[in-house]
């Protein structure tokens, strides 16, 4: 991964990411590097340009730890993991969920508190459902959010390497 401080890169929490193909297309259009981070091997299409695969081993949070460690201003982190989103925001990264939700410093506290409350209720047997199924509108919202994040970073002085 190019680690120049003024360049844009995309870091993907890839194990269960449903929008990897969209990330590859957007990154190619903007000539941006992508780092796919996973706990196991993830196939990358041959035509995907500038995509690096990082397979971490060890504990369940190893991929999250790697992404948090490499998060920085100019990085766009794609994750559905709320605690990882919080850690990446602390490092100055832009964070987008696969459903297109943009996490910010001003919203992540409430999102994290809600997640923790639902986890507690689920542990107590009060909540049995999970998130809504991934839908085409989520894919569209994600593409818009990713393009917006890249445009904002370019306007802020970051560039493709």
UniProtKB/Swiss-Prot annotation:
InterPro entries: UPF0178
TM segment ranges: none
Top-level taxon of origin: Bacteria
Disulfide bonds: none
Coiled-coil regions, chain positions: none
Pfam families: DUF188
Family to which the UniProt record says this protein belongs: Belongs to the UPF0178 family.
Protein name, per record: UPF0178 protein BCAN_A2024
Organism in which the protein naturally occurs: Brucella canis (strain ATCC 23365 / NCTC 10854 / RM-666)
């Amino acid at each position: 991964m190019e680690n120049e401080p003024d360049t844009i890169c995309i870091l993907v929490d890839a194990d269960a990411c449903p929008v990897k193909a969209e990330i590859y297309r957007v990154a190619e259009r903007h000539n941006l590097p992508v780092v796919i981070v996973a706990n196991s091997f993830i196939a990358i299409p041959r035509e995907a340009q500038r995509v690096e695969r990082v397979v971490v081993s060890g504990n369940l949070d190893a991929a999250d730890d790697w992404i948090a460690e490499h998060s920085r201003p100019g990085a766009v982190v794609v994750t559905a993991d709320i605690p990882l989103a919080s850690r990446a925001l602390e490092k100055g990264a832009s964070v987008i969920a696969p459903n297109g939700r943009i996490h910010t410093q001003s919203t992540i506290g409430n999102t994290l508190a809600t997640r923790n409350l639902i986890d507690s209720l689920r542990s107590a047997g009060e909540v049995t459902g999970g998130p809504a199924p991934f839908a085409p509108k989520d894919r569209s919202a994600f593409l818009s959010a990713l393009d917006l994040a890249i445009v904002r970073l370019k306007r802020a002085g970051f560039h493709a390497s």
